[in-house]
């Protein structure tokens, strides 16, 4: 993506606006990103960012509950929202001539969400039901336990969806205070991509957003995760169909100089993914090392790695679903062996070239749709800077085989790892 075509504009109230014209189709997308996620939650209020996201689909005086669904569908558009560790985002993708509708919706709910008590209680039920559905998946139990074990000081310790005890206790006032604190123009990024003229669309942005008042300074963030002092292990025993293994290593944030080599390492192990780092969790690249070593040999039903960008140091993880004739301990050994091979022998130039080609294909795919372009720009702006979209491409292209070996030796060590096993209880195996 050429940043020459991305324009940055900041309103007096602090709202950052990124625009990119894309005239290949008569479509435009409107995204608003807030710099708030589970990273900004304290004990007792876990899951509150995700719950607030739900509440913003429950109406304002201008757009009552249910109207949003109808008006966007009537105009041939799509919409959604999501919450992650470091951010919350909302979007509407519409025919280009109806982009103004997205601006109306997002400027309105930035300040006018109702948080009606009856809707708070309804969403409490919805969110708890979502949590219970999440807990029905063994891999989620294991992942939550591994991450909680990996982090002792940083709020990344907590699941984005929250703990049930907190979801039962959070009040309407808690939710509204969180909303009033973080949903302000000076804590938001508006990203517009599509078939429009920049000057004209900026006039509309100023019409809808310029009069919104900025918020007070955000609560300070002090948490720093201490360096790990040795391997930790956790075992989860619950109903399930098969044993699972997750190995997580504390790894650098996305602004670190070693981020690009670690992205390449992830691609070597599991295949390239888009620079939005969305998706994952299933094996898609049959030539990747983990697939060849664990799936082709019928040790595991799937085996993947994952390394996603985060504002603060998070994890580089390996996951595998064990075939019923094998044990988690065998799969752990096989996963660690693949890491040790890279640490000891490195990777070949040809392997790096293959991964580079895969990454270029994923990047090209990311640029195909206006929604993906906005996702890419917004993700990187809230984590670091939208300019990283260009610089990261250059960083990835500059990675050498010895860089991949070095980061494997530096970060994927016993000292920095948490090993998790999921062992099905006997009753679930019949």
Spans of features found by a protein language model:
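Carbohydrate-associated surface elements
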Residues: 195
């Amino acid at each position: 993506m050429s940043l020459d075509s991305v324009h940055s504009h900041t309103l007096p109230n602090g709202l950052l606006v990124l625009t990119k014209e894309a005239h290949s189709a008569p479509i435009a997308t409107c995204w608003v990103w807030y710099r708030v996620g589970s990273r900004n939650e304290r004990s007792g209020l876990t899951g509150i960012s995700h719950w607030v996201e739900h509440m913003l689909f429950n109406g304002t005086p201008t757009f009552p509950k249910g109207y949003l669904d109808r008006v966007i569908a009537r105009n041939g558009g799509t919409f959604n929202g999501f919450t992650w560790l470091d951010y919350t985002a909302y979007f509407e993708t519409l025919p280009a001539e109806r982009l103004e509708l997205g601006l109306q919706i997002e400027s309105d709910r930035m300040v006018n969400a109702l948080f009606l008590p009856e809707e708070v209680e309804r969403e409490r039920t919805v969110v708890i039901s979502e949590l219970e559905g999440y807990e029905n998946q063994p891999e989620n139990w294991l992942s939550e336990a591994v991450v909680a074990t990996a982090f002792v000081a940083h709020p990344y310790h907590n699941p984005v969806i929250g703990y049930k005890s907190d979801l039962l206790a959070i009040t309407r006032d808690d939710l509204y205070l969180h909303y009033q604190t973080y949903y302000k123009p000076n804590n938001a990024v508006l990203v517009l991509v599509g078939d429009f003229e920049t000057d004209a669309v900026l006039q509309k942005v100023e019409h809808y957003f310029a009069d919104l008042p900025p918020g007070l300074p955000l609560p300070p963030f002090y948490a720093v995760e201490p360096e790990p002092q040795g391997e930790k292990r956790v075992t989860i025993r619950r109903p399930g169909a098969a044993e699972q293994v997750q190995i997580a290593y504390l790894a650098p944030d996305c602004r670190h100089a070693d981020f690009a080599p670690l992205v390449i390492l992830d691609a070597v192990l599991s295949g390239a993914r888009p620079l939005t780092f969305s998706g994952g969790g299933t094996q898609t690249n049959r030539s990747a090392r983990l697939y060849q070593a664990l799936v082709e040999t019928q040790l595991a039903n799937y085996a993947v790695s994952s390394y996603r960008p985060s504002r603060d140091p998070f994890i580089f993880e390996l996951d595998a679903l064990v075939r019923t004739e094998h044990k988690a301990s065998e799969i752990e050994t096989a996963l660690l062996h693949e890491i040790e091979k890279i640490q000891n022998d490195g990777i070949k130039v040809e392997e790096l070239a293959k991964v580079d080609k895969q990454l270029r294909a994923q990047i090209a795919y990311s640029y195909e749709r206006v929604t993906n372009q906005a996702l890419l720009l917004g993700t990187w702006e809230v984590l670091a800077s939208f300019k990283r979209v260009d610089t990261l491409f250059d960083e990835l292209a500059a990675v050498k085989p010895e860089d991949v070996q070095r980061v494997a030796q530096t970060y994927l060590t016993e000292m920095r790892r948490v090993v998790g096993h999921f062992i099905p209880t006997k009753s679930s195996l019949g």
